[in-house]
């Protein structure tokens, strides 16, 4: 009986360690009924970083991304000014649930692409990846950033 309990504890620790290892600052994971994907990520969490975003960059590696983090849920808008990379823009709630996708944005376009409701995270990825991965409304954002003292759903 003691041996069985010891193995249970060991397996639990391994599973928890693996789960926590997936929630790191330099990577973001998306998951849903479609499967999952891992991206390297740059975090933009100050006004200056969010304003600059991916402007004036010539390229973005296939599974690279930028995560915009806001202090609290709010309606946000993005444009493609000085951005030469076509992007998919993914808007996530404070709980890390996908709310909107603005796909295949046009480089240099000044049209403001607003979220349909309050969001706390926005993830920019290369254009076409949202469709290729078949991202849907059940997509969850996994990242180490805290939300009101709690981790996003998949990082708990």
Regions found by a protein language model. Name each.
Residues 1-3:
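N-terminal secretory signal peptides that target proteins for export/translocation
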Residues 5-18:
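Bacterial N-terminal signal peptides
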Residues 22-156:
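Compact, glycine-rich, soluble single-domain proteins
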């Amino acid at each position: 009986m003691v041996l069985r309990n010891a193995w249970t504890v060991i397996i639990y620790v391994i599973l928890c360690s693996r789960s926590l290892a997936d929630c790191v600052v330099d990577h973001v994971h998306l998951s849903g009924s479609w499967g999952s994907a891992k991206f390297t990520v740059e975090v933009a969490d100050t006004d200056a970083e969010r304003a600059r975003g991916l402007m004036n960059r010539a390229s973005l590696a296939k599974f690279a991304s930028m995560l915009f983090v806001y202090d609290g849920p709010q309606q946000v808008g993005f444009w493609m000014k000085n951005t030469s990379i076509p992007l998919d823009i993914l808007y996530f709630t404070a709980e890390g649930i996908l709310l909107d996708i603005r796909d295949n944005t046009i480089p240099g376009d000044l049209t403001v692409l607003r979220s349909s409701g309050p969001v706390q995270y926005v993830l920019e990825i290369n254009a076409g990846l949202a469709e290729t991965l078949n991202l849907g409304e059940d997509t969850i954002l996994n990242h180490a950033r805290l939300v009101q003292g709690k981790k996003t759903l998949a990082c708990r």
